[in-house]
Structure formats: C-alpha cells, structure tokens
Amino acid sequence: MPLIHRKKPTEKPSTPPSEEVVHDEDSQKKPHESSKSHHKKSNGGGKWSCIDSCCWFIGCVCVTWWFLLFLYNAMPASFPQYVTERITGPLPDPPGVKLKKEGLKAKHPVVFIPGIVTGGLELWEGKQCADGLFRKRLWGGTFGEVYKRPLCWVEHMSLDNETGLDPAGIRVRAVSGLVAADYFAPGYFVWAVLIANLAHIGYEEKNMYMAAYDWRLSFQNTEVRDQTLSRMKSNIELMVSTNGGKKAVIVPHSMGVLYFLHFMKWVEAPAPLGGGGGPDWCAKYIKAVMNIGGPFLGVPKAVAGLFSAEAKDVAVARAIAPGFLDTDIFRLQTLQHVMRMTRTWDSTMSMLPKGGDTIWGGLDWSPEKGHTCCGKKQKNNETCGEAGENGVSKKSPVNYGRMISFGKEVAEAAPSEINNIDFRGAVKGQSIPNHTCRDVWTEYHDMGIAGIKAIAEYKVYTAGEAIDLLHYVAPKMMARGAAHFSYGIADDLDDTKYQDPKYWSNPLETKLPNAPEMEIYSLYGVGIPTERAYVYKLNQSPDSCIPFQIFTSAHEEDEDSCLKAGVYNVDGDETVPVLSAGYMCAKAWRGKTRFNPSGIKTYIREYNHSPPANLLEGRGTQSGAHVDIMGNFALIEDIMRVAAGGNGSDIGHDQVHSGIFEWSERIDLKL
C-alpha cells in the first residue's frame, strides 16, 4: 500500500509584534465583511419575482382549501349543527319533523307554481355563439354564460319584439320537474325547504308537482307555444284520480299567483281559447289555493323596471357608477342591454299596477296615508304602521298616490301648486344626440328630445297615468302587452268582453270560480320597507340611452323617514306592498261579492319579518322577505296542515300585523 506523503507546511515569516496586532484586527474584520457580502449575494439571488409571489399565493390557497375540505369530510355530520346550537341555542324542529310527531300524513296532492325569474330555463336551439350549450341552463344555476359571452346570452334570453315568442333560430324552454325551481342558484333555495318538509310526512313526486313554465311569456302564450296550461290541467286531474279523489292544494308564489288566476279562468272556458273543463272543474279538483307573496294588484317596482330598468338597489348603483351602467364598457351587459331584454318579456307587464287611482290613490290621497316608516324594529311585534298614535304619523304624510314625481319638491307639493303640461300631445321626432343607442334599441331613441322633456314637464304621475306614460315611452311594447293584459276595474262582469283571456289575470275584471267549498289564502311577509313611489330626474349623461333615472339624492336622513334614495317605502315584503298582497282577500273577495259570487272563504296570514340573528342562521326561519319567506317555518307549517287535511280554522283564521283592513276600507270600490 503506497504511503501518503504529507506536504510540509511552509513556515510563516516572522513579523514584529506591532504588525501582529494589526494583522489580527484585520483578520477579525475580514470574516465579518465576507459574511456581509455573502449575505448580500444570497439576498440578491433570492429576491422573489411577481411570478414567485403568485405561485406562493396559489399554493397557500390550495393547501388551505384542501385542509379545510379534509376537515369538512372528517368532522361528524352533526358538528355544524352543534356549533350553531352552542352559539344561538337549541334549534327548533323543522315543521316536517314537528308535524310528523303529531301524526300528520300526506293527504292532498300539492302543486307548486313558481314566480317570475325563479324557474330555470335551458337552451334547446341557438345561434353559433351558443355552441356547446344544448340543454344547459341559461337562467338559474351558476349563470356562467353571463360572464363568458354576455351579448350572446342577452340575445338568447330575449324574445321577439313583435310577437313575444321565440326569435328565429332560438328555442329556450323551461326546465321540468321539481328541480326546475327548488334552487335558483347553488345554495340559494326557493322551493327546496318546503319540498323537504313535505317529504317528512310522506310526500314524494307522485303527489307533488312543479308546474314549471317559461315565465318570460305572456300567460296565454305559454299555452300557445308550450301547452303548459293543458299539461297543468292533465297533471292535476291525474294526481287527484291516483290519490283517491282527494282534491289538490295549489301553492303559487309571486307572479305564479297571477298565472294561476289566469289558469282558473282558462280551465273552465270553452275551447279553443280555454281548456274546456266546464264550470265545475275548480270545485271538483281544487281544495285550496295558498298564495305566497301574491302581487294581485301589481307592484310599483314593475313601473320603474320598464320605465328606467331600475329598482331601488340598481338606482343606487347607477348613481355611484354611472359610467359602468350607462355605457357599454368592455361590451358587458349594462343597463341598456337589460332594458332591451326585459322589454321583450311580456310577463313583466302582468305585474303593472291594476285598478288605477281607485286602488292606489291620487295626487292628494292614498289608502296607506298616515303610514309610519320605522328605522328600528318595534317592540311587542309592532309593525311600522303602528308606531304612531292610532297608526298615524306625526310627520307630514307621504303622497303615495304620486307613483312617479320629477323632483322631491313636486312629490311634497300641494296639488294646487303642481302645474302639469300634458305630455300626450308632445311632438316626437328630434333625434337624441347619442346615435349609439340604436345598437341597444329601447324606443327612447324614437321619442326625441321634445318628447323626453314633455314627460319631465308633466311632473307627477298617479298609477293610472303611469300606464299612459308607458304607452307613450314604449308604444310597441305596450301595444304587444295590451293584447294579453288589462289594468282596469270591471263595471259589469257579465259583459261578454271579459271572456277575452287578457282580463283573466286581473282579479278586478274577473269572477272567482263557482266553488263554495274551495278556500283561498293570502300568505305574505310584512315589516320590511317596500317600494311604493319614486322621485325621478332627467339623466344628464351624454352616453346614456335611458334618459330617466331615480333621483337617489332625494333622501331624508331621519331614520324613520319613508323616503330613502329617491324611493318612498311602505309596509310589505320588500317587493309586494301589503295593499297588493292583501286587499282582495281582506275585502274584495271577503264574503259574497260580485268578484266572489259563490262566497269562497278567504284568509289572510301575515308573517312579521324577523331577520336572522347571525350568519349561521343563513336566510332565517322567520323571514318575511319576498323569496326568503319560502323558508319561514310558520308559513311552511300552515301549508302542511292544509295539505294534510286542515282548513282555515285549523291554522287560526286570519293573522294580521299590518293595517290592511283599515287601508282596504278607504278604497271606494263597488262590491
């Protein structure tokens, strides 16, 4: 084995002691300096770029997501309920569990009738831009196509502006089955909670039916195009015959209430306009109609929607970001596109206010005059209308009869101080400067500047004049709607003209069926500020295709003021005022009247709104809001008791928190 020779170290030259000291100090400094330079190099070489930061962030999100998903799947199913109960206290049993313990069982078949926008719509035929969307939901679900291809989506969701039916080459149809409207979007229930509770006492698809329809169409056109009314008639007859002859309980919601009013006239009318069921069909097949949030007499919100494509929340957003909503930024679906699309939906005209000034009031009066708006929740279950002495506000009364006012001063002025200049004779024709509006045609372009100014100079519009206003600003749309809907009050219900289907969804121009054993319920929420009248102004934006907008600066800081962001509020469920939801069952149909010749029993059940106490309660079990009320335990229990064989006396007759009976007495209508 070879030897390893070590090299002899070289000897250092001797140095003087003084030099040794200096050398030692330098040697102590050099390692320190070298470590600093090494640290600088490592820092410079390790500096993160933007891509590194993004990757790190995405990695953290993914790891956190997978960790939370692991915990969610690992924890017991009862853990979320345990946490909720520890924070809020024990949860009450759902109505289905409670009534099952009481021994209630499924008896009468139940039919659900969804309202506007809550039912899913899917594509069956479309243009090239919609490739890959066959039988995919265009409305409901995730709404993914709104973001991916907004203009294509608007084109396919619009109807033909002349016929109110399908445009050439496009077929969009209602989703069928209970899944059509159980959830509007993932996690946002509509009918799902009611369906689940009914299942607890034995209901299933053989005795539950979702009467889905294309809610964009006029009611009669759902039969012309899809035979929806015929299928509803056949399904009700089938369920009654296969359930031992037990009559059906009908549960319509929102616009579905008007749709079923139309159906009750259609089913008994002779063919070809009607279903040919005969005058006793409703008496034979229907036990009760339990209307939820029914806009029997229309909603002021429909006027604002057709006039300026706004409601309260949209108006606030438009005021904050006018450039985004009033111009076609990045080719997004902005306000003009919304108006172009919704004005092709005939169904929106079904919810315009009915009864004119007789029902909704005039320049100096309204049924709700003296109503007090409350900023804070009242004690002892009081609603806002009860806050003042004898339900009368100490402040100057709100003129709810003025549905549209141009300026806050006009809304508050005495009738003698208002100088109207009639808009009906104004000459149209001078073009609006913004010629890009032709790409998003809304009929305002054809009015001209003179016509637009004439509308503002008329200053104030009551409910009856608001219909005239819409005829002026959108004559083609309203002409199409006039063939399907009417908004008046019948003088003689025996007149043969009321056999026309356009009157069938107006309870003031039709009779209820001859079915004395049938019951009609009006179930709705109260205690939430609800749109009743609007303060408008001319839109000064040169880029806007919509010349009018809600004047959001018309506002009163007082917490108890009824005027907020250009909107006068009244009691209701946030969408439907109490007057519209309750008047027919409170007075016009109560007992034997010309509108209810057989004396069908009517009941009012109001549910005082109680918002969820915290986020863990979701949308709440005591909500009175227009859609959230579908999860209200008290409402669900009332419906289930009637479906299980009960009647109005079993659920406590009327339950009223608002001033509906007092307000109804102020309406001078021949009964």
Swiss-Prot record:
<protein>
    <recommendedName>
        <fullName>Phospholipid:diacylglycerol acyltransferase 1</fullName>
        <ecNumber>2.3.1.158</ecNumber>
    </recommendedName>
</protein>
<keyword id="KW-0472">Membrane</keyword>
<keyword id="KW-0444">Lipid biosynthesis</keyword>
<keyword id="KW-0319">Glycerol metabolism</keyword>
<comment type="pathway">
    <text>Glycerolipid metabolism; triacylglycerol biosynthesis.</text>
</comment>
<feature type="active site" description="Charge relay system">
    <location>
        <position position="573"/>
    </location>
</feature>
<keyword id="KW-0812">Transmembrane</keyword>
<feature type="topological domain" description="Lumenal">
    <location>
        <begin position="76"/>
        <end position="671"/>
    </location>
</feature>
<keyword id="KW-0012">Acyltransferase</keyword>
<dbReference type="GO" id="GO:0009536">
    <property type="term" value="C:plastid"/>
</dbReference>
<keyword id="KW-0808">Transferase</keyword>
<feature type="region of interest" description="Disordered">
    <location>
        <begin position="1"/>
        <end position="46"/>
    </location>
</feature>
<feature type="transmembrane region" description="Helical">
    <location>
        <begin position="55"/>
        <end position="75"/>
    </location>
</feature>
<feature type="active site" description="Acyl-ester intermediate">
    <location>
        <position position="254"/>
    </location>
</feature>
<feature type="glycosylation site" description="N-linked (GlcNAc...) asparagine">
    <location>
        <position position="161"/>
    </location>
</feature>
<dbReference type="InterPro" id="IPR029058">
    <property type="entry name" value="AB_hydrolase_fold"/>
</dbReference>
<feature type="glycosylation site" description="N-linked (GlcNAc...) asparagine">
    <location>
        <position position="381"/>
    </location>
</feature>
<keyword id="KW-1133">Transmembrane helix</keyword>
<dbReference type="GO" id="GO:0006071">
    <property type="term" value="P:glycerol metabolic process"/>
</dbReference>
<feature type="glycosylation site" description="N-linked (GlcNAc...) asparagine">
    <location>
        <position position="434"/>
    </location>
</feature>
<dbReference type="GO" id="GO:0046027">
    <property type="term" value="F:phospholipid:diacylglycerol acyltransferase activity"/>
</dbReference>
<comment type="similarity">
    <text>Belongs to the AB hydrolase superfamily. Lipase family.</text>
</comment>
<feature type="active site" description="Charge relay system">
    <location>
        <position position="626"/>
    </location>
</feature>
<dbReference type="GO" id="GO:0016020">
    <property type="term" value="C:membrane"/>
</dbReference>
<dbReference type="Pfam" id="PF02450">
    <property type="entry name" value="LCAT"/>
</dbReference>
<dbReference type="GO" id="GO:0008374">
    <property type="term" value="F:O-acyltransferase activity"/>
</dbReference>
<feature type="glycosylation site" description="N-linked (GlcNAc...) asparagine">
    <location>
        <position position="647"/>
    </location>
</feature>
<keyword id="KW-0443">Lipid metabolism</keyword>
<keyword id="KW-0325">Glycoprotein</keyword>
<dbReference type="GO" id="GO:0005783">
    <property type="term" value="C:endoplasmic reticulum"/>
</dbReference>
<dbReference type="InterPro" id="IPR003386">
    <property type="entry name" value="LACT/PDAT_acylTrfase"/>
</dbReference>
<comment type="function">
    <text>Triacylglycerol formation by an acyl-CoA independent pathway. The enzyme preferentially transfers acyl groups from the sn-2 position of a phospholipid to diacylglycerol, thus forming an sn-1-lysophospholipid. Involved in epoxy and hydroxy fatty acid accumulation in seeds. Has complementary functions with DAG1 that are essential for triacylglycerol synthesis and normal development of both seeds and pollen.</text>
</comment>
<feature type="compositionally biased region" description="Basic and acidic residues">
    <location>
        <begin position="20"/>
        <end position="36"/>
    </location>
</feature>
<feature type="topological domain" description="Cytoplasmic">
    <location>
        <begin position="1"/>
        <end position="54"/>
    </location>
</feature>
<dbReference type="GO" id="GO:0000325">
    <property type="term" value="C:plant-type vacuole"/>
</dbReference>
<dbReference type="GO" id="GO:0019432">
    <property type="term" value="P:triglyceride biosynthetic process"/>
</dbReference>
